[in-house]
C-alpha cells in the first residue's frame, strides 16, 4: 500500500496515540517471567509487539490478547519456567524483539533460533553477540546478522561492560542476561539512552543499582507480577507534533503521552527551533511520567543539533528532518550513524525523499545537512520503513502539491491506526493501491 497526501488547511482536535512500543515490548517480556498474573493496559497491538507476544507464547507463557481493548493478561511462568520452542522464533521486523530475546535466552537451559524478515536479517547483531559471549553465551550467526542460533547456558557470569555507543537495546539485552548470571552485571553507557527496562525492573520489584552512567543487576532474583498501564508513544506523537508545528492554523492536543526524560529529544530540539509546545497535566504511573502535549503552529529556524540530544531523539529524526526542511536556515545533524542501521538507512532515505520534494539535503557519514526551503509535491519511497513513511506523510501537510509515499505497509509494525488518526486531526492522508500516479 502507498500513502497519498494533499496539503492540509491546519490540524485541530485532541487525540490519544497508541501505547508506547518500547514499553510494550519490555512489559510483556518481564510479565512473562514474573510470578503471578499481570494485566497490561494500553499495549501496542502493532506487528512488532505481537511478534514478541508470539515468541513468548511459543515458550510456554500464557498471554491472553484482548486486541480491541489493547489489553494483555499475562500468567507469568517465573524466572525458570520458559520452555524450548518447537521451531525458530520469528521476530518479524523488530530489532528490539530480537535483541531483548537474545538477552533473555542466553541464560536458558535450551537452545533457540531467532530470525526475522529480510530487513531484520540485515541488521547488525555483533553489538550484542560480543558482550553476551563475554558472559559465557554461545551464539552462532553468519556475518553477525540474523538468524541467530543461541545455545542456552544457565551458568552465565556477570560482567562490567562499557557500551561503545548509547543503545537502549544493547543495554536492555545485557540486563536481561544479567538476571540469569552469577554475580553482578554492570553496564556503563557513554550517554543516557531510554531507561524503560530499568524502570520496569523496579516496577516488577527487582532490585537494581543505578548511578548517572551505570546500571547494575545481580542474578538470582525474582520478578513479581504487577499490573501496568502503558502511556502513549512519544515516537508516534512526534508525527503530529511536527505536523501541527509546521502547518499554519494548527492547534492540537495529544493526551497521556509518555514524557520519559530519556525520550524528550524531539521536544527539546523543536523548542530550540522555535516550536510552540506546552506540556501539561504531568503525572507519574508505573514508574513512567505522562502528560498532555499541546502544539500550535510556529515558524522554525534551523539549528546545529547538540550531540547529547541525538540518543534521546534517535527514532524521531525522520520526522524532525521534515521540520528542518521547512525551517529558516540550515540544520546540521552529526553523531547519528546509528540511523544508517535501522529498518533502512534512514539518512539515505530521508535525503533521497527530501531532494525529490525540492529540498537541498546533503548526506554526511553520520548525519545530514538540510537547508530549509519549500516542499514541493512529488513521489518518494519509504524503503519499507514505517517511520520514513509517516515522516513524508507529515511533509504532505505543507507541500505545495500532493505527495505519494511508496510502500507503506510497514506502518502496521508501530502505528496501525496512523491514517485514521491523521485524518481525524486534518492531515489528509489516504492509503492507495496500485502504481498509478497523481
UniProtKB/Swiss-Prot annotation:
Pathway: Metabolic intermediate biosynthesis; chorismate biosynthesis; chorismate from D-erythrose 4-phosphate and phosphoenolpyruvate: step 6/7. CDD domains: EPSP_synthase. The active site is at residue 315. Keywords: Amino-acid biosynthesis, Aromatic amino acid biosynthesis, Cytoplasm, Transferase. Monomer. Catalyzes the transfer of the enolpyruvyl moiety of phosphoenolpyruvate (PEP) to the 5-hydroxyl of shikimate-3-phosphate (S3P) to produce enolpyruvyl shikimate-3-phosphate and inorganic phosphate. This is 3-phosphoshikimate 1-carboxyvinyltransferase. The gene is aroA.
